[in-house]
Amino acid sequence: MTSGNNINQPVTYPIFTVRWLAVHTLAVPTVFFLGAIASMQFIQR
């Protein structure tokens, strides 16, 4: 990290990685189901 000519070029961090896919395949249904369960608490029978 001593050479300062790659300030706008981070080392090798692309946005769409396997980690990104793994996080979002877990996080998106989790948020969806939490919202659905939370909204089901307020449905009157």
Swiss-Prot record:
Cellular component per GO, a single term: photosystem II reaction center
Main subcellular location: membrane
Lineage: Bacteria, Bacillati, Cyanobacteriota, Cyanophyceae, Nostocales
UniProt entry keywords in alphabetical sequence: Electron transport, Heme, Iron, Membrane, Metal-binding, Photosynthesis, Photosystem II, Thylakoid, Transmembrane, Transmembrane helix, Transport
Cofactor note: With its partner (PsbE) binds heme. PSII binds additional chlorophylls, carotenoids and specific lipids.
Binding site for heme: H24
Its job: This b-type cytochrome is tightly associated with the reaction center of photosystem II (PSII). PSII is a light-driven water:plastoquinone oxidoreductase that uses light energy to abstract electrons from H(2)O, generating O(2) and a proton gradient subsequently used for ATP formation. It consists of a core antenna complex that captures photons, and an electron transfer chain that converts photonic excitation into a charge separation.
Superkingdom, natural source: Bacteria
Assembly: Heterodimer of an alpha subunit and a beta subunit. PSII is composed of 1 copy each of membrane proteins PsbA, PsbB, PsbC, PsbD, PsbE, PsbF, PsbH, PsbI, PsbJ, PsbK, PsbL, PsbM, PsbT, PsbX, PsbY, PsbZ, Psb30/Ycf12, peripheral proteins PsbO, CyanoQ (PsbQ), PsbU, PsbV and a large number of cofactors. It forms dimeric complexes.
Cofactor: heme b
Annotated TM spans: 20-36
Family stated for the protein in its record: Belongs to the PsbE/PsbF family.
Name of the protein in question: Cytochrome b559 subunit beta
Membrane topology: Single-pass membrane protein
HAMAP family named among the record's database cross-references: PSII_PsbF
Location of this chain's protein in the cell: Cellular thylakoid membrane
Keyword Iron: yes
Single Gene Ontology MF annotation: heme binding
Alphabetical GO biological process terms: photosynthetic electron transport chain
Gene (UniProt): psbF
